[in-house]
C-alpha cells in the first residue's frame, strides 16, 4: 500500500516522524552509554568515578569488578604517585604490605584504547600477562604505554576505563608530597587511601 504525503500536512507529518526518529536514536545512544559499569572510589581526598569498557576489555573489566565486589580495594592506598605520569594503587595497605590476589589475567592492551590522561589501566610487571589487581590512572597522555606489537616490549598496558567524575581529585592526589619508603619510591608522605570501592552501575 502506498502512502501519499502531500502539501503542508504531509510535510508536517514527515517532520514529526524525523524528529521522533532523532529522539529515539539519541535515547538509544544514551542508554548504550549508561550501560557501561561505573565504579566509585571513595578516597581520603575525595571521590573518583570510573566508567569501564567491558566491550573493549571484557576480561580486565570482569576481573576489576570482582575485586571491587569482594571489597578487596577497601583500605588500600595509592602507593606510587608521579605527578607527570600517573597515580597507582589497588594492591598495598597503609603499612606497604602487598595483599594476596587471584591469578594474573591476559593483557588486553591491543583493544584500541590508548593511555590518555584520566584513563585507567592495569599495572603489571615486565611480563605482559602479569596484571592482577593493581591499576593506575594516567595524569598525562602516556603514549609510550600504548600497544604497538605482540612482543614483551610492545604489548603495552591495558586501558579498561576512564575517570568520568572526580578529575579534580586525581589532580589533588598527583600533587601530594612523596618520599621513598623501604624499597618503594614515590610513596605519598601522608597515605592516600581508597576507603571504599563500590559498583554504582553494573
Language-model features and meaning:
Residues 2-7, 13-202:
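Cyclophilin-like peptidyl-prolyl cis-trans isomerases
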Amino acid at each position: 500500500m502506498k502512502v501519499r504525503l502531500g502539501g503542508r500536512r504531509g510535510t508536517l507529518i514527515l517532520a514529526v516522524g524525523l524528529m521522533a526518529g532523532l529522539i529515539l536514536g539519541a535515547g538509544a545512544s544514551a542508554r548504550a552509554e549508561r550501560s557501561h559499569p561505573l565504579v566509585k572510589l571513595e578516597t581520603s581526598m575525595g571521590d573518583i568515578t570510573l566508567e569501564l569498557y567491558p566491550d573493549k576489555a571484557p576480561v580486565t573489566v570482569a576481573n576489576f569488578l570482582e575485586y571491587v565486589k569482594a571489597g578487596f580495594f577497601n583500605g588500600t592506598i595509592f602507593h606510587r604517585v608521579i605527578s607527570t605520569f600517573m597515580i597507582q594503587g589497588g594492591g598495598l595497605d597503609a603499612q606497604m604490605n602487598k595483599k594476596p590476589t587471584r591469578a594474573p589475567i591476559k593483557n588486553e592492551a591491543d583493544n584500541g584504547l590508548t593511555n590518555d590522561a584520566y584513563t585507567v589501566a592495569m599495572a603489571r610487571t615486565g611480563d605482559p600477562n602479569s596484571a592482577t589487581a593493581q591499576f593506575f590512572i594516567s595524569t598525562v597522555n602516556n603514549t609510550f604505554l600504548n600497544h604497538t606489537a605482540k612482543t614483551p616490549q610492545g604489548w603495552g598496558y591495558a586501558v579498561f576505563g576512564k575517570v568520568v567524575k572526580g578529575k579534580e581529585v586525581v589532580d589533588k592526589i598527583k600533587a601530594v608530597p612523596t618520599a621513598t619508603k623501604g624499597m618503594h619510591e614515590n610513596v605519598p608522605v601522608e597515605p592516600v587511601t581508597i576507603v571504599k570501592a563500590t559498583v554504582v552501575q553494573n
